[in-house]
């Protein structure tokens, strides 16, 4: 027992602290329930996405040209590395 009647104030603070913790736990439980609901929907979306990916990958991209090699052989020299690195004067190599 505390002198001066301070025991009631301590009980009130303890009660509010417990209520705040309980409210926080309820919010976390609600958040986890919403997450579980979203995960249940994800299976349906995942199957639809897989089907879309198979369809998209089976068709060629209409914006990209279909080539089996370089369009111009002389352009290859610009994209190849140097044949002899000792004689190369490039700063980035």
UniProtKB/Swiss-Prot annotation:
The keyword Electron transport does not apply. One of its GO terms (biological process) is G protein-coupled receptor signaling pathway. Keywords: Cell membrane, Coiled coil, Glycoprotein, GPI-anchor, Lipoprotein, Membrane, Methylation, Palmitate, Prenylation, Transducer. Its main location: membrane. Residues 91-93 form a propeptide. A lipid is attached at residue 90 (S-farnesyl cysteine). Residues 20-93 form the G protein gamma domain. Pfam families: G-gamma. A lipid is attached at residue 88 (S-palmitoyl cysteine). Residues 12-52 form a coiled coil. InterPro entries: G-protein_gamma-like_dom, GG1/2. The modification Cysteine methyl ester is found at residue 90. It is found in: Cell membrane. It comes from the Eukaryota. It is a lipid-anchor; GPI-anchor. One of its GO terms (cellular component) is side of membrane. G proteins are composed of 3 units, alpha, beta and gamma. Interacts with the beta subunit RGB1. Guanine nucleotide-binding proteins (G proteins) are involved as modulators or transducers in various transmembrane signaling systems. This is Guanine nucleotide-binding protein subunit gamma 1.
């Amino acid at each position: 027992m505390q002198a001066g009647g301070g025991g009631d104030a301590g009980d009130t603070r303890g009660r509010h602290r417990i209520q705040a913790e309980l409210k926080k736990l309820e919010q976390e439980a609600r958040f986890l329930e919403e997450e579980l609901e979203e995960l249940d929907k994800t299976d349906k979306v995942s199957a639809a996405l897989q089907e879309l990916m198979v369809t998209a990958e089976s068709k060629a991209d209409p914006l990209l040209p279909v080539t089996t090699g370089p369009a111009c052989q002389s352009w290859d020299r610009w994209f190849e590395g140097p044949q002899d690195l000792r004689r190369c004067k490039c700063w980035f190599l």
